[in-house]
Design a protein with these regions (language model features):
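Short hydrophobic/aromatic beta-strand or adjacent loop that forms the aromatic wall/cage
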Residues: 25, 104, 176
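Short, basic/glycine-rich phosphate-binding loops at helix/coil junctions
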Residues: 98-104
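Short beta-strand segments and strand-loop junctions that repeat across beta-rich extracellular domains
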Residues: 175-184
Length: 212
């Protein structure tokens, strides 16, 4: 096993957290100016429709979410490094708003194909993301950027009445993915940034991955 993985595992054992589960998100984030613009939209929605959830969630496009024991995190991150480095940067274009009746309002993603293809690459490490039969990774099939979710009926009805007529347009270059982690009772925090390097894909088998 290589020295990097050994150090990570030793650190987790020392803190006593590696046997506890955590929630993870792998996301794409807009550049700072667009991020701030979308954050303002979310803040306004939260104020106008008394929706604290819109204020809490930060702007991102989810690729996969999963729950897993923290002992598996080093292996998950190594698998993501190996798969994501094969990707090349691509443009994401967003236009206007959409909804999942009757609970979520989001920004439409126009350029979905490359995001879906990115998810396919990320799936290469799914065996490390499955905690048990009741906790399997959820890979996104309909990319979107959430403004507000878990809406009450009145929040959705009034919110969608307004946002279905609003205009929005934004674009950014996706050149990395960000892994976020949340332990019980905590907020999500970044744990690693995976840069799209357009490197030649290597055949990865479990023994090679861990240098066993």
């Amino acid at each position: 096993m290589n020295q990097y993985i050994m150090k990570q595992l030793a650190s987790e054992v020392a803190t006593g957290n590696n046997q506890l589960p955590a929630e993870y998100l792998l996301v794409l984030q807009p550049h700072e100016a667009l991020w701030n613009e979308i954050k303002f939209i979310k803040e306004k929605f939260a104020t106008d429709f008394d929706c604290a959830m819109a204020r809490i969630g930060l702007p991102h496009i989810t690729l996969v979410r999963f729950k897993q024991y923290q002992a598996a995190e080093v292996r998950i991150r190594q698998a993501l490094r190996n798969s994501i480095k094969t990707l090349q940067p691509f443009k994401i274009e967003m236009k206007d708003f959409g909804s999942f009746p009757s609970h979520t309002i989001y920004i439409n993603i126009v350029s979905k194909v490359q995001i879906v293809n990115t998810v396919k690459v990320v799936r290469q490490g799914q065996r490390f993301m499955k905690m048990d039969k009741d906790n399997k990774p959820h890979f996104i099939t309909e990319p979107h950027l959430t403004i507000a979710r878990k809406l009450l009926p009145w929040q959705y009805e009034k919110g969608w009445l307004e946002y279905s007529h609003k205009d929005f347009h934004g674009r950014f270059i996706a050149d990395h993915a960000l892994l976020l982690k949340r332990r019980q009772g905590e907020k999500y925090r970044p744990v690693e940034k995976f840069v799209f390097q357009n490197e030649k894909e290597e055949e990865i088998v479990q023994g090679d991955l861990f240098n066993l």
